[in-house]
């Protein structure tokens, strides 16, 4: 990236143009100057100072599924460079490590007293079956590094897992790390996702797990087969989604104490934009299981929500830009 253009802007670090549309629209509607930086490949001059502005990272742990396996380490390099020059980042260097590791997420959540699923971390697929022996059943497997339900499968026994691996039906994780995890039974077939931007609660949504399964990405692009344009049957879903049906719904009037606990968690971890997901069980548990730091927003939810997620991000970043560069107002 060249620093020839010195006007301060919001620099958006990302790798998936399919997810950027709502944010582009929000920036343009609010008159916020921005520049996309697609971290797919490129050249980084460590001796050149970064251009003026605020840097917002939206790199996803699922980047490798789009052929962008280099994006993760490229982003780490860019964020190290930005930190070295004192640039202001949003969801910066620490955040990308939490985004890339569910082990990191779960250990940090547990350290702050959240109820998280019983989990066993397995490095090397050849150790999975042995690790599953004696683990409470049913259980799920999950990739440490990923999103969109990557590697999530439900098994009723270690023998069933062994058969799946032998048949070639177990997808190898990108970083070689799998999670064996308690299958948390929800009181209703839904999970809740809490959206927080700049330490403010924006809204909460529910996701229908009967139709959404383990793939609960709110972005509209996640629900469509990119080749055929047909609705996908997500892994773990028990009901085929149909045109006109909505997996996501606004959870109106949500005012749970967990909101303030999530805000405190994000402050402690230095995360400024996130969606955190939890399951409520019939016996009263509130089980937090995922922290999404490159959060997407669903168009149907946005149409009825009291606040816009992308709009709130545009406003938050614009305020940071104005504070950092008052002469540019």
Could you say what each language-model-derived stretch is?
Residues 5-11:
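Extreme N-terminal starter segment of soluble prokaryotic enzymes
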Residues 60-63, 144-146, 294:
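Short glycine-rich anion-binding loops that position phosphate/pyrophosphate groups of nucleotides
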Residues 2-4, 84-86, 93-191, 198, ...:
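Active-site nucleotide/adenylate-binding loops and adjacent lid/helix of ATP-dependent enzymes
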Residues 15-118:
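Conserved N-proximal alpha/beta basic substrate-recognition cap immediately N-terminal to
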Residues 12-13, 197:
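Short hydrophobic segments within beta-strands
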Residues 139, 202-203, 274, 287-289:
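Protein kinase-like catalytic core scaffold
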């Amino acid at each position: 990236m060249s620093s020839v253009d010195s006007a301060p802007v919001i620099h958006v670090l990302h790798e998936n143009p399919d997810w950027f549309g709502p944010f582009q629209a929000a920036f343009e509607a609010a008159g916020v100057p921005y520049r996309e930086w697609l971290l797919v490949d490129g050249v980084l001059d460590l001796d050149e100072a970064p251009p003026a502005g605020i840097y917002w990272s939206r790199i996803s742990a699922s980047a490798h599924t789009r052929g962008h396996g280099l994006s993760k380490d490229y982003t780490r390099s860019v964020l190290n460079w930005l930190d070295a020059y004192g640039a202001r980042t949003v969801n910066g260097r620490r955040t990308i490590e939490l985004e890339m590791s569910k082990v990191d997420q779960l250990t940090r959540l547990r350290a702050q007293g959240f109820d998280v699923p019983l989990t066993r971390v397995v490095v090397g697929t050849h150790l999975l079956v042995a690790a599953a022996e004696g683990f409470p059943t049913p259980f799920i497997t999950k990739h440490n590094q990923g999103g969109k339900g990557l590697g999530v499968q439900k098994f009723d026994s270690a023998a069933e897992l062994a058969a799946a691996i032998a048949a070639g039906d177990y997808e190898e994780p990108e970083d070689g790390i799998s999670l064996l995890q308690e299958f948390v039974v929800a009181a209703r077939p839904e999970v809740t996702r809490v959206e927080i931007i700049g330490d403010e609660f924006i809204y909460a949504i529910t996701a229908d797990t009967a139709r959404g399964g383990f793939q609960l990405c709110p972005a509209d692009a996640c629900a469509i087969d990119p080749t055929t344009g047909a609705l996908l049957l997500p892994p773990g879903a028990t009901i085929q989604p149909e045109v006109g049906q909505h997996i996501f719904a606004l959870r109106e009037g949500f005012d749970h104490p967990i909101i303030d606990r999530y805000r405190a968690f994000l402050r402690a971890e230095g995360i400024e934009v996130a969606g955190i997901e939890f399951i409520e069980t019939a016996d009263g548990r509130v089980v937090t299981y995922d922290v999404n730091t490159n959060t997407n927003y669903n168009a149907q939810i946005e149409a009825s929500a009291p606040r816009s997620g992308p709009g709130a991000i545009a406003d938050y970043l614009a305020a940071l830009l104005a504070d950092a560069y008052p002469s540019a107002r």
